[in-house]
C-alpha cells in the first residue's frame, strides 16, 4: 500500500488535505478493527482537519488507556516459567485487542503508551522496547521484522505553524508507514507523513521528518542519509547466526532448547 503523506514540496512541511482520502479510508475499514465508522474518523485518517474532542473518540481513547494500563502493570504471580509465560500470553492478548491489526508474533516491553490503538497495524515479529509512544490519530503501519528501540515516539497528529490557525484549534493527522526489516534505534522521533523504506536503519536520537529510502542508514536532527546498505550474499555472511525466540513464542518444551 502506498501512503499519501500530503507533503508540501515547496517547504518540505506538512499541509492538511481538503478532501477525504478514499484509498486510506477503504484500507482502514478493510484492515483495522474497532475503528469509528463516522465522518470525523474519515477526516482523521485522511489528513483533513478533524475534531479531536469528538465524544466517540474520547470514549475510545479512555477505553484504550485502561487496556494499556493493565498491560503495563501485569506481573508474573511466581518466578516459574509457567507463570511468566502466562503473563506473556495475557499481555499479547491485550495487544491484539488494542491494536487495529496484528500478526501472530508481536511483543512490546512495558511500559508503552498509545492514543487510540485501533489505527496501529503491526507485522510479524514486531518488537518494541521500553517507553515507546504511538500517537495514532492517523494509521501507523509496520511491516514484518521491525525492531523499535526504547523511548521512541511515532507522531501522526500535527498542527498549523500559524498561531492564528492554532488558536482555532485546527488539528490534522498524517500516516506513518514503516517497511519490512527496519531497525529504529533508541530515542527516535518519527514525524507525521513519513514513510520508512524496507531494510533501513534509523540511528539513535534521530528526528525523522522526511521519507527514508530503502536500505539506508539515517541519523541526526533532522535525519539525513548517512550511508547506503549494500545487499549481502547470504552464503558469504560472516559469523554464526543466533536463533532465538521472543518470550511469547516459547513454551515449556522450547524454554531449555532456545537461547
Swiss-Prot record:
It comes from the Eukaryota. Acetyl-CoA binds at residues 129, 186, 204, 209-210, 224, 227. The active site is at 159 (proton donor/acceptor). Keywords: Acyltransferase, Repeat, Transferase. InterPro entries: Hexapep (IPR001451), Hexapep_transf_CS (IPR018357), Hexapeptide_acetyltransf (IPR051159), Mac_dom (IPR024688), Trimer_LpxA-like_sf (IPR011004). The keyword Lipid metabolism does not apply. The keyword Transferase applies. CDD domains: LbH_MAT_GAT. PANTHER family: ACETYLTRANSFERASE C18B11.09C-RELATED, SIALIC ACID SYNTHASE-RELATED. Catalyzes the optional acetylation of acidic sophorolipids (SLs) at the 6' and/or 6'' carbon atom of the sophorose head group to produce acetylated acidic SLs in sophorolipid biosynthesis. Has no activity toward lactonic sophorolipids, confirmimg that acetylation must precede lactonization. This is Sophorolipid acetyltransferase. The gene is at.
